Amino acid sequence: HEMAATLTAVRGAWPERRVVVAFQPHRYTRTRDCLELFADVLSSVDEVVLAEVYPAGEAPIEGADSEHLADAVAERTGRRPTVSTLEDLPAAIARTARAGDVVVTMGAGSIGRIPAKLTGRNE
């Protein structure tokens, strides 16, 4: 799975640092189909912040949203990730991350705009 491979590489590059993942699930159908896999992978990092699902034109599906994904991560780790709107995601990351942490953003939707907001760049 590409998420697991990416996070393994991050851990290998910075083994002594905490890893914080900000993840925006893409599509409700994919979130439904991959919820357990996503929860397993996200449970391997130190902290998780979730954005709401990027719907890509799909209607919501009961049980296939970021709140349910947060519950699944909490079942595995005992810590429930923060679920945030995309607009509030930079602030949620700032509240979660510490100096020296590696922050990784993942997702196929509008989360691509977040790294520039975190670094103060307007790109």
What are these regions (language model features)?
Residues 1-123:
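ATP-dependent carboxylate-amine ligase
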